[in-house]
Structures are given as C-alpha cells and as structure tokens.
Amino acid sequence: MNLEVVDNFLPRDKHLKAFGFVKNAPARWGEYDDLPEKPAGSSIHIKKEDQIFQYFDKVARDRFNQLNDPGFDLVRMYVNVFWPHECPRWHIDAHPIEGLESYTVLYYPHLDWDRNDGGFTHFWRTDHTIGHFPMPNRAICFDGTIWHTATA
C-alpha cells in the first residue's frame, strides 16, 4: 500500500483561506460511502470553475508526482463534514479498472487538532488497519481503490 503524506501542504496564507472556505461554505446532508441508502455525513461540493478547485489541483500535482500525468484529470472535489458520533463506512473511491489509475487526495484544512477530537483515517489491510492522524494542513495521496474510512 502506497500512502504518501505531505505535511504543511499549503502555504500558511492559503491554509487559512482554505479553512475559512470550508468553515463558511454550506454543507448538505446525504454524502454516502458505499450505500446510497445509508448516508454517513454531510459534504460541501466544489465546482471545477471555483478558484479553490483550480488552485488545489495545481498544488496537488506539484506535491504528488503520481498526479503529474498530463492526461490525468481531477474529476471531483468535495469536503467531508462529520458531526460527533456519525458513523462513516468503509469504502473505496474508485472501482478498479485494468489500465486505469485512480488517486484520492485527502486534505485536512482545520487549524488545530487534539487526539480526543477523532477524525482519523484508517486504511484497510488484510489483517489490520493503518491509521493516520488528521494533522492540520496535511494531505494524503493514495490509490483510490484502497478501502478506507474516517472516524467522526
């Protein structure tokens, strides 16, 4: 399993701007992981024409070499919004297709974090999980076909 972690993903001013964006954007209930009939939280969908979409695409390509293929397109950007005690489900972000690569980039825009806040991301292995803390301004890039889940 290849998980690439980058701390201090955005410059400080852009990190603060990203935090302000997600803090003030309207979230909608109904985001689901694997089963549409079992929503796991809310989300903020970001449009391709939004400046933040274009900026994040550029920075992700600069920071993660596997995204530098000129034919590779960012197809969806959204913000997960979980409230305490919500139960995200195990899921994959893309179904495996031979000859087609798919990547997910998780970004944590919050300004501070305490271990009792939760918010960990777990990645499935055969007999265990690998967990990552949601450190502020951290990004994780991984194969979109890897099973993963968050904790609220």
Kindly give the residue locations of the regions a language model identified.
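Catalytic core of non-heme Fe(II) oxygenases with the double-stranded beta-helix
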Residues: 54, 58-152
